[in-house]
Amino acid sequence: MPKVGMEPIRRQQLIKATMAAIDEVGLAEATVMRIARHAGVSAGIISHYFGGKDGLLEATMRQILTDLSDAVAARRHALEDDSPRAHIGAIIEGNFDRTQVTGPAAKTWLAFWASSMHKPVLQRLQYVNDRRLYANLCHQFQRVMPKADARNAARGLAAMIDGLWLRGALTPEGLDAAEARYLAHTYLDQLLTHYGCYQDASTADFK
């Protein structure tokens, strides 16, 4: 009989094992048996908790997305400056949080992006994540520029964040998070300057 309270622990253990297996051999070769070996459990446990490999991959991506949301929220909550530029900066920082850029997390993200083109459940997760990033950026940009400009700025910065992340994740040495953050912040400042609202966006009590 399983111990009371073991399920959350076991689920986290299997999610970490999934990321480790994908990091080691890629998604296609990350079999249920290999994941189970990484976790030190029987393969039947995966079916018991997740219904199989697809369910486990979905749970793994939900965990990474939760980590991303938490990283952004923590940075925004800690802000002493309520300016749009500060909030957008926190969003940038959260997207390059260590939970998103380690080898296992990065390779799991890449596997997720590829699989989402063919698996509706993963495609929905990807859509929700994309919309959340765009909506959060757009809301802050709209505080200092017209709606049409804010939408364009949000699309541009979201693409910049995704592009920096993707290029970094595909390099043999891995993603340089510090460089990616610097480039994204630089692009943000260029956007604000282009739309003529750098000063307003940097001030919490602008009119």
Curated annotation (Swiss-Prot):
Keywords: DNA-binding, Repressor, Transcription, Transcription regulation. It comes from Chromohalobacter salexigens (strain ATCC BAA-138 / DSM 3043 / CIP 106854 / NCIMB 13768 / 1H11). Repressor involved in the biosynthesis of the osmoprotectant glycine betaine. It represses transcription of the choline transporter BetT and the genes of BetAB involved in the synthesis of glycine betaine. It holds the Pfam family TetR_C_6. This is HTH-type transcriptional regulator BetI 2. It comes from the Bacteria. Gene3D superfamilies: Tetracycline Repressor, domain 2. One of its GO terms (biological process) is negative regulation of DNA-templated transcription. Residues 8-68 form the HTH tetR-type domain. Pathway: Amine and polyamine biosynthesis; betaine biosynthesis via choline pathway [regulation].
